[in-house]
Curated annotation (Swiss-Prot):
Limits of the tr-type G domain: 475-644
Comp. bias (Low complexity): 104-115, 178-211, 302-330
Binding positions for GTP per the UniProt entry: 484-491, 530-534, 584-587
Stretches for region G5: 620-622
Record key words, sorted: Cytoplasm, GTP-binding, Initiation factor, Nucleotide-binding, Protein biosynthesis
Pfam families: EF-G_D2, GTP_EFTU, GTP_EFTU_D2, IF-2, IF2_assoc, IF2_N
The organism's taxonomic lineage, starting at the top: Bacteria, Pseudomonadati, Pseudomonadota, Betaproteobacteria, Burkholderiales
Protein name: Translation initiation factor IF-2
Composition-biased stretches (Basic and acidic residues): 48-63, 120-177, 212-263
Matches recorded under Gene3D superfamilies: P-loop containing nucleotide triphosphate hydrolases, Putative DNA-binding domain, N-terminal subdomain of bacterial translation initiation factor IF2, Translation factors, Translation initiation factor IF- 2, domain 3
Gene this protein is translated from: infB
């Protein structure tokens, strides 16, 4: 519809009429109201105004561009001399612009440029003037402040001077007044003396004058005393300042003297010190002493160490060597002692490799035995004969050994071993590691006996007598493991026994670490192991049952036997450990101990009152009821077991828990099972070894040693050991390192073999099942047990469609290497009771890596499960939306068959799919090509209306057919 007035044009533009009136007035079109007529010229002026205001130009309408092409052919000879025809196309392009537009545009541009330059110059001058005014104002302000400060100082000085002058004048006036008063008093006294009687006139004025004179004398004395005190104080202060300066000067001189003495002492040669402390040699002739002390022109004085080394050679007349003093001047042989000091020679001797037939340690002989060194050593060689009989050694060859270590075991040079290996066809280096078979062949080739050492077995390194066969067996405290279902009160029971509050500090109120404590009771010491009750911590409970003597099975009286209770019973029975049942929470109203007993009897735990061997003790961790009876039963079981262990022997134990502390390094909680573990011992725990640098008890207090059944926390291992590894004390750190490295290599081989098998298995499964979604994860936990439990729990979530892939799992904080690994593998990092450092957080933000922190295992498992649910392919469901009956069929050229239909049920949508039914049999399933009502395309047709429909790629439509219209919806799935 054409717009004739302002209101209609505004409705067409979908904008308020008031705004359109403002734009028209700005464009120079005078329209007062919405009903004013609007012509095409007015619209054109409005359009030009809007284009100019938005920066558009109408240059495209005022210029014409012509392009002309011209094609020609040229002939040119190629490299072979043949003529070739080449098509050449020439393009010419010309643009024609109206002159008035060009001139107007140029003038406008020049004017605009001039205006801009003038405006910029004006702004620059205004800015300079403003800056200059600010600078002048600032300088004037500073000048005013300086003048005010000087005036204030001058006023203060004048005020002080005036006050001092007024004080002086007041003092003079007081003194003059006192003198005038004294003179008047004397005159009055004299006049009174003349009038009155002589005796009385003389006595009274005399008293008054005496009092005045005494008062004046006292004032003068006080002034003199004050002046004297001020003078003494000033003199005292000056003396004190002079004394302090003198003290500072003396200290400086003393420090300089001390520094000078230290420099002189450090610059003093060492040989003078050695010579001063050398004991006298009475057996030496005095002449030799004088010669050595003074020296000669050809032989300077030797240091004390070198002279002492030269004396034994001087006592051997059979050597035949000429004296150094008698050597000719032209002899170029290097004399001992002319260029090296004694301590340098000793160091050279120590560095040399001692071999048979060379007692000098290789000193003063180059690595090439040249002719220059032969004459010097011929006589010394005659004094020592190498053994002619070969020495056959028994060499214990471990699983792996380096070339240098093998040569050291045979007491030969490493180069000899390398030569033998080269003859055998192998090029090796001094640090290359050989396997056991190759090393044994080399040993036999060199004429020694090779024995295979079983270094992986720690018992082979210790003599049976040292292990404890002769050590005295002494009674040891029992190790008691507290087991049961989650939230049955295991930690609370231990807290009441230990008088501690561990359960209150647990995240989520559940135990997620295995804890070790020892408690002193009136009847002895008892060591407790607290295990988690959650189903994920199966391995922790198994370790606790392995290291224990007695199991306390905690069962809640109001809950009964639960799955983890049954698991704890199976662990205890597998280890052959006696069970003491503690029925907890008997203080609750809903407690039913009899039902608990019946359920435990069904699991094979029979109470003593029923004829079994398991004592049942009802307890309450809240009120403390039955705790003493429980401890009594535990100690009674320990007495029956007669637990003993050697004390004076190397310690053996088991790793209860291990973690990586940021400040302490690898930390392991060890339960000593036999012997005594002391600080400084060399321990081996699985693939980790080291010397015990620090040892703490369960309360964090340092301890020097730990006996049997005592849990301690040790530091100083090379890496984090595995929870459950055996700990043994070895006498030699080198052997411990050798065993640990061998175990690492074997563990690495087994791990690689498992990975290869897993890869092959997963590849075959993927080929059989198709595409499988993977959720890569990197898990970092605070302790080994938590990491192990979390990995197992997450791996159990894997299904046939979505699998959890543990890229890496370790103990400790989240580092930059973990973030880089996550970037490469596109994994999510899970931190369980750990945090990422600043560099790792920054790198994760830069690379978009998701880091999740958890302190409760439930939360971690639930969130990973939700993430896996989101990765599942959605389920597709068909929803029938309507039914259509074909009433008439039309054949349309170039279109196909069109069905005239009636919607009998539901609704038909343009985007729906269609299923064609003929006699209730599906003959086609496809999509709608068009949906029309009369001549218009529509999006949907509801029930009771007619419509026209055509199907894609299907024209076999017959009257009476039915169309079933349906939609496919996707429904999210969950695990």
């Amino acid at each position: 519809m054409a717009s004739n007035n302002v209101a209609q044009f505004a409705a067409e533009l979908k904008m308020p009429a008031g705004v359109l009136l403002e734009q028209l007035q700005a464009a120079g079109v005078q329209k007062a109201s919405e009903d004013d007529a609007l012509s095409e010229t007015d619209k054109a002026r409005l359009l030009d105004h809007l284009r100019k205001s938005h920066g558009a130009t109408d240059g495209d309408k005022r210029k014409i561009t012509l392009t002309r092409r011209h094609t020609s052919e040229i002939k040119q000879a190629d490299a072979t001399g043949k003529a070739r025809t080449i098509q050449v196309e020439v393009r010419k392009k010309r643009t024609f612009v109206k002159r008035d537009d060009v001139s107007e545009t140029g003038a406008d541009q020049a004017q605009a440029q001039t205006d801009e330059q003038a405006e910029a110059e004006l702004k620059r001058r205004e800015e300079e003037a403003r800056r200059e005014a600010e600078l002048l104002e600032k300088q004037a302000q500073e000048l005013r402040e300086r003048q005010e400060r000087l005036e204030r100082e001058e006023a203060e000085r004048r005020a002080r001077e005036e006050a001092a002058e007024a004080e002086r004048r007041r003092a003079e006036e007081e003194a003059a007044a006192k003198r005038a008063a004294a003179a008047q008093a004397e005159a009055a006294q004299q006049a009174a003396a003349a009038r009155e009687q002589a005796q009385r006139a003389q006595s009274e004025p005399a008293e008054q004058s005496a009092q005045d004179e005494a008062r004046a004398a006292a004032e003068r004395a006080a002034q003199r005393e004050a002046a004297k005190k001020a003078e003494d104080a000033a003199r005292e202060a000056a003396d004190k300042a002079r004394a302090e300066q003198e003290e500072i000067r003396k200290r400086r001189e003393a420090a300089e003297a001390e520094a000078r003495a230290i420099r002189e002492m450090m610059n003093t040669p060492r040989r003078a010190q050695v010579k001063a402390v050398e004991p006298p040699k009475p057996a030496e002739p005095p002449a030799a002493k004088a010669a050595e002390a003074k020296g000669t022109l050809h032989k300077p004085a030797k240091p004390a160490g070198e002279a002492a080394a030269a004396r034994p050679a001087a006592k051997k007349p059979a050597s035949g060597a000429p004296a150094p003093a008698a050597a000719p001047a032209g002899d170029r042989t290097k004399k001992p002692g002319t260029g090296k000091s004694g301590w340098q020679d000793d160091a050279a001797k120590r560095r040399g490799i001692k071999t048979r037939g060379d007692s000098s340690g290789g000193v003063d002989r180059g690595w090439r035995g040249g002719p220059k060194g032969r004459g010097k050593h011929q006589d010394s060689a005659s004094s020592f004969q190498a053994p002619t009989e070969p020495i056959v050694r028994e060499v214990h060859v471990p699983e792996t050994i380096s070339v240098a270590d093998l040569a050291h075991k045979m007491s030969i040079k490493a180069s000899e071993v390398i030569k033998v290996m080269m003859k055998m066809g192998q090029m090796v280096t001094i640090n290359q590691v050989l396997d056991q078979e190759t090393a044994m062949i080399v040993v036999e080739e060199l004429g020694h006996r090779a024995l295979a050492a079983k270094l992986d077995d720690p018992e082979a390194l210790l003599v049976e007598g040292e292990i404890g066969s002769d050590a005295e067996q002494l009674p040891r405290p029992p190790v008691v493991t507290v087991m049961g279902h989650v939230d049955h009160g295991k930690t609370s029971l231990l807290d009441y026994i230990r008088r501690a509050k561990v359960a209150a500090g647990e995240a989520g109120g559940i135990t997620q670490h295995i804890g070790a404590y020892h408690v002193e009771t009136p009847r002895g010491v008892v060591t407790f192991l607290d295990t988690p009750g959650h189903e994920a911590f199966t391995a922790m409970r198994a370790r606790g049952a392995k290291a224990t003597d007695i199991v306390i099975l905690v069962v809640a009286a109001d809950d009964g036997v639960m799955p983890q209770t049954k698991e704890a019973i199976s662990h205890a029975k597998a280890g052959g450990v006696p069970i003491v049942v503690a029925i907890n929470k008997i203080d609750k109203p809903e407690a039913n101990p009899d039902r608990v007993k019946q359920e435990l009897v069904a699991e094979g735990v029979v109470p003593e009152e029923y004829g079994g061997d398991s004592p049942f003790v009802p307890v309450s961790a809240k009120t403390g009821a039955g705790i003493d009876d429980l401890l009594e039963n535990v100690l009674l079981q320990a007495e029956v077991l007669e637990l003993k262990a050697p004390v004076e022997s190397p310690a053996k134990g088991i790793v209860i828990e291990a973690k990586l502390d940021k400040g302490k390094g690898p930390v392991a909680t060890v339960l000593v099972q036999s012997g005594t573990l002391s600080r400084g011992d060399v321990v081996l725990a699985g693939t980790a070894y080291g010397r015990v640098r620090a040892m703490l008890d369960e309360n964090g207090k340092p301890t020097k040693e730990a006996g049997p059944s005592i849990p301690v926390e040790i530091q100083g291992l090379s890496e984090v050991p595995g929870a459950g590894d055996e700990v043994i004390v070895l006498p030699d750190e080198r052997k411990a390192r050798e065993i640990a490295l061998f175990r690492q290599g074997k563990f690495r081989d087994v791990k690689l073999a498992k990975q290869q098998a897993a890869k092959l298995e997963s590849m075959l499964e993927q080929m059989g099942e198709g595409e499988v979604q993977n959720l890569p994860l990197i898990i970092k936990a605070d302790v080994q047990g938590s990491q192990e439990a979390l990995v197992q729990s997450l791996l159990k979530l894997s299904t046939d469609e979505v699998r959890v892939q543990i890229v890496h799992s370790a103990v400790g904080g989240i580092s930059e290497s973990d973030v880089n690994l996550a970037t490469a593998s596109k994994a999510v990092i899970i931190g369980f009771n750990t945090r990422a450092d600043a560099q790792a957080r920054k790198l994760a933000e830069a690379n978009g890596i998701d880091i999740r922190y958890y302190n409760i295992i439930y939360d971690a498992v639930d969130e990973v499960k939700a993430a896996m649910s989101g990765m599942l392919a959605p389920e597709k469901r068909e929803v029938v939306t309507g039914m259509v009956e074909v009433r008439q069929v039309f054949k349309v050229p170039k279109v196909g068959t069109v069905a005239g239909c009636m919607v009998t049920d539901g609704v038909v949508k343009r985007s729906s799919s269609v299923r064609v039914l003929r006699n209730n049999v599906v003959i086609f399933t496809g999509e709608l090509d068009s949906l029309k009502r009369f001549k218009d395309d529509v999006k949907e047709v509801k029930q009771g209306f007619e419509c026209g429909m055509s199907l894609k790629n299907f024209n076999d439509i017959v009257e009476g057919d039915q169309f079933e219209v349906f939609e496919v919806t996707e429904v999210a799935r969950t695990l």
